A protein has these predicted regions:
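N-terminal pre-domain and mature-chain start segments
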Residues: 38-42, 50, 57-78, 116-117, ...
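Short cysteine/histidine-rich zinc-coordinating motifs and their immediately flanking basic loops
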Residues: 162-169, 177-180
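Mixed-charge, glycine-accented linear interaction segment located at domain edges/termini
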Residues: 38, 111-166
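Intrinsic, low-complexity N-terminal interaction/targeting segments
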Residues: 1-27, 69-127
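Short, structured motif recognition centered on aromatic/hydrophobic residues
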Residues: 25-31, 51, 55, 107-111, ...
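The feature marks the first
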Residues: 1-53, 57, 61
Length: 181
């Protein structure tokens, strides 16, 4: 089997970012390591939300007594999203995998380029401290919560206009019928 294309070793920078206005946002993960390499991984909103959930499950499994997400709290020294140099690698994520390297006591993240073979070796592999993962999970929760509100019945994003909701059997609410805000 071929080796991973980019082995980032242990990362010292791990951030999630949403760019743009709700409904028109793009999402990315930014990773950096001690060697000064940077990776920009473009990711869909559903993927970033699933990543946050998967991180929470992994950390709960590793530390059942410590279930709380780390609040984002004070910003890292560099503002989120600032890249001082062009990234070493940049691609759109097709699939992600999480794991745990028990020998090193570090979490593992593997990402496959959307254009690559999902059954082949990952495009990027890195090791992440549990505290970094917990912080990333908090960032992801913050990013996802700032998006468009969702319909409480069907879960679809609301755009501010009339909304067709299958569970409501096509009926509009009184406010939607009258154009009330």
């Amino acid at each position: 089997m071929d080796e991973v294309r980019y082995d980032f070793a242990t990362v010292n920078r791990l951030e999630a970012e949403a760019i743009g206005r709700p409904g028109q946002r793009t999402f990315r993960l930014i990773l950096g390591n001690e060697r000064g390499e940077t990776a920009v991984l473009w990711i869909e909103k559903e993927q970033v939300q699933a990543l946050g959930d998967a991180i929470d499950r992994l950390l709960a499994h590793l530390n059942p007594r410590r279930l709380k997400r780390l609040d984002v709290g004070p910003r890292p020294p560099e503002p989120v999203g600032v890249l001082l140099d062009p990234p070493t690698i940049e691609f759109k994520i097709g699939t992600l995998a999480l794991g745990y390297e028990a020998e090193q006591r570090l979490c593992l993240l593997q990402a496959h380029d959307i254009e690559g073979d999902p059954e082949g070796p990952p495009t990027l592999r890195c090791l992440i401290r549990q505290q970094q993962f917990r912080r990333l999970s908090g960032q992801i929760a913050g990013i996802v919560s700032t998006g468009r509100p969702r319909c409480t019945m069907c879960g679809q994003p609301l755009s501010g206009g009339p909304h067709f909701c299958p569970p409501s059997n096509g009926h509009l609410t009184r406010a939607e019928r009258l154009g009330d805000d």
